[in-house]
Amino acid sequence: MSKYVITKTLNNNVIICTKNHQEVVLIGKGIGFNKKVGMTVQENASIEKIYKLEQQEQQEHYKTLLELGEDHVVQAVIESVNIINESGLITDDKNLVVALTDHIIYAYKRLKQHQMITNPFVIETKHLYSNAYNVARKVIDKLNKTLDVHFPEDEIGFIALHIASNSEKLSIHDISVINKLINKSITIIETDLQHSIDKQTIQYQRFIRHIQFLIYRLTKGEYLEAQENFISMIKTMYPRSFNTAYKILKMIQREFSVYVYEAEIVYLTLHINHFEVQISSE
């Protein structure tokens, strides 16, 4: 049976070991209790997680985080990663475990100090990444119970972003950019229509999903096609919505410094017109 040589004990639940000249992080309840440097650990059921972080910088950062966290917080992180793994949304949790450990440890410290950070994109995250959001809710429910705290819904959104960035192969930055552009688009619509948009409607969900895929197409160099006469017809039928759609596309074009094809304005106009009809019927 394989053995690991202990090089450092971080706490009762986490130890740093080497095996075949490879440094690994072993996590398991009570795995570090009464353990000292130089002792060996067999690979058995007491080891809940084995992390082989490839990059030295990543290794050092993760070890520093684990030293900062209290035993029960580190255990809560382990349980959180298990919940996410069991969801089937991700295939490789190496990057996620570092990001999640970092986030949960500091979120817990902020909560204890009554210094919570507001998440302006909770609704957008909930609609765009519903599967990740549902799993994140389970994570937060578990953290609340395990740590005897009450994280606000903002934290569900933050955890969901970490899950989504791993499951959809997008960086947190990419997702943040998409959310910001959605917010800017909604601001343009609300300004032109002089009315707030209800973010709990199916129409809103469809709109933000459309913006998301529009941005995907731009980043991949893909584009929609539409006949010129169809574009002219939409412009004549829905002039106000068309004008608003034009503003949004110009804004996106500036943000990405890429050309946005005219065909995009057709489908965007139709989405905006749905908002206009919805508002006029109130």
Curated annotation (Swiss-Prot):
Q: Which UniProt keywords apply?
A: Repeat
Gene Ontology MF annotations: RNA binding
**What Gene3D superfamilies does this protein map onto?**
1.20.58.1950, 1.20.890.100, CAT RNA-binding domain, PRD domain
Question: What residues does the PRD domain cover?
Answer: 68-173, 174-282
Name the InterPro entries for this protein: BglG_antiterminators, CAT_RNA-bd_dom, CAT_RNA-bd_dom_sf, PRD, PRD_sf, Transcrpt_antitermin_CS
Q: Which GO terms describe its biological process?
A: positive regulation of DNA-templated transcription
The UniProt family comment states: Belongs to the transcriptional antiterminator BglG family. GlcT subfamily.
What is this protein's record name?
Answer: Protein GlcT
Instruction: Identify the species of origin.
Output: Staphylococcus epidermidis (strain ATCC 35984 / DSM 28319 / BCRC 17069 / CCUG 31568 / BM 3577 / RP62A)
